[in-house]
Amino acid sequence: MLDVNLFDELRIGLATADDIRRWSHGEVKKPETINYRTLKPEKDGLFCERIFGPTRDWECACGKYKRVRYKGIVCERCGVEVTKSKVRRERMGHIELAAPVTHIWYFKGVPSRLGYLLDLAPKDLEKIIYFAANIITSVDEEARHTDQETLEADIFMEKKEVEADRDEELAERQQKLEEDLKELESNGAKADAKRKVQNAAEREMRHIRERAEREIDRLDEIWNTFIKLAPKQMIVDETIYSELVDRYEDYFTGGMGAEAIQTLIKNFDLEAEAEKLSEVIRDGKGQKQVRALKRLRVVAAFLRSGNDPAAMVLDAIPVIPPELRPMVQLDGGRFATSDLNDLYRRVINRNNRLKRMIDLGAPEIIVNNEKRMLQESVDALFDNGRRGRPVTGPGNRPLKSLSDLLKGKQGRFRQNLLGKRVDYSGRSVIIVGPQLKLHQCGLPKLMALELFKPFVMKRLVEKSYAQNIRSAKRMVERQRPEVWDVLEEAIAEHPVMLNRAPTLHRLGIQAFEPVLVEGKAIQLHPLACEAFNADFDGDQMAVHLPLSAEAQAEARVLMLASNNILSPASGKPLAMPRLDMVTGLYFLTLEKSEDQLGGEGAYHEADENGPKRGTYSSFAEALMARDRGVLGLQAPIEVRISHLRPPEDIEAELFPDGWQRGQKWTAHTTLGRIMFNELLPWNYPFVNGVMAKKAQAVIINDLAARYPMITVAQTVDKMKDAGFYWATRSCVTISMDDVLVLPNKEEILQRYEKQAATIEKKLARGKINNEERYRSLVDLWKECTDFVGESVEKIYPDDNPIPMIVKSGAAGNMRQIWTLAGMKGMVTNSRGDYITRPIKTSFREGLSVLEYFNNSHGSRKGLADTALRTADSGYLTRRLVDVAQDVIVREDDCGTRKGLEVDVAKPVLDAEGNETGEFTRAEFLETALIGRYLAKDAVNDNGDVIYERGAFVGDAEAKKMVAEGVRTATVRTVMMCETATGVCATCYGRSMATGQKVDIGEAVGIVAAQSIGEPGTQLTMRTFHQGGVGGDITGGLPRVQELFEARVPKNQAPIASTEGTIKLEDDGNFYTLTITPDNGEDEVVYEKLSKRQGLAVTQEPGGFEHQLRTGDHVVTGQPLLRGAPDPHEVLRVEGVTGVQKHLIEQVQKVYRDQGVAIHDKHIEIIVRQMLRRLTVVDSGSTELLPGSLIDRNEARAINKAVATNGGEGAAFRQEIMGITKASLATESWLSAASFQETTRVLTDAAINKRSDKLIGLKENVIIGKLIPAGTGISRYRNISVEPTEEARAQAFSMNTSYGDGFYGEDGAYGEFTGAAVRLDDQGFDGGFGDIS
């Protein structure tokens, strides 16, 4: 087998017949497969052992040679080589065809490569190949010219003869007529009879004239056809062709079928054709030039690649190894076989029949029919169903051809090469494991024993529990008691990987240290649920075992759950307390002035009744008071603390030089809050407040920024334990009695009912139209719902469990409480329009039948939407991954000085709208600025340089930039990165998952695709209605797809191509809009702007909005109508930077509307890939073809090289490609073929003899190589670790001191190094005396 590590690129080309014969181990001559009695392969058949190798290891077919000692011998009796049966997976055969056939991919593909090469229309080509027309392959122009006069004279003579014959026949007929008339006259016949005879004679004479005329016309046609005869001329009329052959076969050759095509290709001069086409492209125009360009692409591909175009017509076809198209016996003696065997059988049958016919000298028409059938059977083998009806098997099922084996989800690429099943894995239901640490998971004993079986067996032998592996295996299978002890040792420090499908982002697989548990369910840490999106309602998870030391190290260092606390999409913590844990911590940190457990221990100021109470000298004393039942958990107290760091304000006041552990300070807090702070690192500033979910998130975010991951992991683990502990003790439960109903709800409803009746009356009287009624009712009932809801909120006491759950942030929101206790309110129908009758009851009261029916509309729509969304979102993720899979961090810094301008601070305005001199953060600072490097100095209004170019901007730096008044900053971005392949670490900035600068080798493209695709399911599917004005506005997932596919949006909005003042004119259903540019250039006129779509809205300085009107000022790129601009138009008007900003803003808008945080850099990576390609406009001195696509970096390199040699560089136009198109246009043919349109990609790659440089991830996965990312990157491959002196000393330090005479004093053998010492060097000869 070929070692994948021995080559760096993979090339695909066209195989010629000689190549096919060279690969082959013999010709398959018979259609038989195996003998039905002996079940042995038939000789020369599709499973022949002589061709493909023996079916049994080291045994020939006849049994003369058996055993490995005869290895390599070819049996003289049966001709089978003695070798391993595995060769039946590798050895190919071939079928010698009796007539050439064309390869269907090159003829039927779009565009038809054969058609472009030979300049024939695909329809004509089809007629020739399938024997419906003849084609002229060559003409002897010279001989024809020489003999033209003679031949013309011959034709002239022939015509004369035809005319003479005609005249003779007419004369005879005339004579006969006269005689007949005479006879009739003599017999006294009537005039009627004479007329009949006369008419009949005239009719006959007319036929004679017409026949002669036809004959002369035919001769003229034959002659004219012959005179104009040229190669590649098609003759459909069979009779004319046979006449031409009969008369002039010495002057031309022609034919039909693939044979004629083969002759044409062999006579084809590629270089001359390329020159001719280049001339047409230079001088031509319009359609002619376009076609010449397309043809030149195919001709140039053959010229450049050195492929032989004749290879598109096959004289022999390969037969793939039999093990790849197996035949297996079923119970009952029947056989199941691969479809390919049927298809090969058809080819062989027809081929043999054709050979026999040719040998017998059968008539041409029969032979041609058989050749056509052979061509069709080879077509079916290569790509069944591509032309005509597919060949079907039993049950009318189309047979799977070679192309079908590669295509689609079940094809070779996606099913077997990109997605393999792996050994050492198991799956089971998951349950919660609250007792686990974050880096642990509970593994059922039986599953662990099965997974670690080999490790356990090895240890059993090592520990002498078993003599050999076989007995160890028996012990394991019988589950002897010692097996469990050994299993404990085997799993120690050996991480396992847990995966939950669907794996939407990289945190869908994480590593954990296994802990053995009883039962059969896997136990999962509660904090890991968020990342896996797991819950415990029957979800299943898969366990995988990393085997090699490297795999274990990577699992532990990179994938361990405690190292993956932050989300790679936004940098926010994912391992966060949720649900019950949040409630518990919220309950713990509440403050109640009078606590349930008695308030004597609570803090009271000194008053006339006595001194102040509730002050404690330490946390321990306060705890003791609680244990005695004097102090409540949530009662306010004053306490002196020395083991926890004070809040920042107190520290600044009391300890200007910084607080040291042990220094005392006084806190006004509650016991619960001190307990909460005990969970945090001791040197984290004391947090004195109620810990709702958002506050907890802020703390964990801060911890992640300040402390190592291990500390954060330990802290969240403690928070988890405390959360569950106090949630249990908080007694938060929900019962029907906790849902309080509004006492005066009926009155409120009656008030609004009256207003609704008034609106209905207005409609009946014609004061308002239907549209206005709808809007008024919707607004009215929404107001009613809100009023009822807010009233409900007020009647709930603080200690009611329902608002407590909501306020803590554990689950739900206030609207759900309104629905429970107030009223459900407005619901939508399946079209998304509101039903104007609201649901007036709450779930506590129960819905009426009609209300329930109305409610079910929208709910059902929601469920259907979710199902559709999941599939759509998955497909979007797949396309994103495909387009970005080769974006890997390749170097530290590309050195570019370009960057993207982002807003940092905006001025604070006073009541009059003037700047106050203070600044506040720009709106999207987190996702745009933080985590990047500066491309230019950050300067404020005074010109002070706050941070220099190259500085990193984290949270603290961003804060300072805002405070100093830096309005905008130019940051490094992947879109401007100049790294040849992939991106550089400086342009990418901080890895969101680690908070550090991204490592070289990080597959940032995949992370970006997952970050955008993973929240895809949360996006809505809906189109927003704009009440008829702007039609529908696409939102949610469809909008994201529209943007990433660079589609022209529905209801496209034209954009201003220049800056200036507008003038509007009304033209009935349309507007005409004229822009007068500020720079004095010609006016720009936009005609036929739809009124239905509506004019765009513009903002006035005061923040008010209005529709565009005459006199308004517009800037370049501003939309003129409602709707979304076309990205291609934005690129044309605003250039690359404009379209980059447009795409990022628009995608972010959709995600922000759903409350999803994604850093801009992820979207930028996808946008970079969309703008990677340029179109060649003018080739200059380069070899490039106008109209061809080229990678931006490659274009830069080519122009640089040409300029060095003094040539003229090519001119390019920037293209924006949708992600699907961009994936298919990738340099890697393996990656493109495994994505979509497999046959088209492979056809194109083969003609161009494409070479895949194996740069991306997919192509390396496909060929089974380590991916060039992470630890698989070349620079990390051959690292050898040299221990430092300190490490060596640490590893081998030994503190034991023997100090006895036998071993000598310490130091007698020098410093201890851990190296073995030869005893005879030390004077020992092994004579230790008699030890017995």
From Swiss-Prot:
What is the required cofactor set for this protein? Mg(2+); Zn(2+)
Q: In terms of domain of life, where is this protein from? A: Bacteria
Enzyme class, spelled out: transferase
List this protein's GO terms for biological process: DNA-templated transcription
One cellular-component annotation, GO: DNA-directed RNA polymerase complex
User: What does the record give as the function of this protein?
Assistant: DNA-dependent RNA polymerase catalyzes the transcription of DNA into RNA using the four ribonucleoside triphosphates as substrates.
Q: How does it assemble?
A: The RNAP catalytic core consists of 2 alpha, 1 beta, 1 beta' and 1 omega subunit. When a sigma factor is associated with the core the holoenzyme is formed, which can initiate transcription.
The protein here is known as DNA-directed RNA polymerase subunit beta'
What lineage does the source organism belong to? Bacteria, Bacillati, Actinomycetota, Actinomycetes, Mycobacteriales
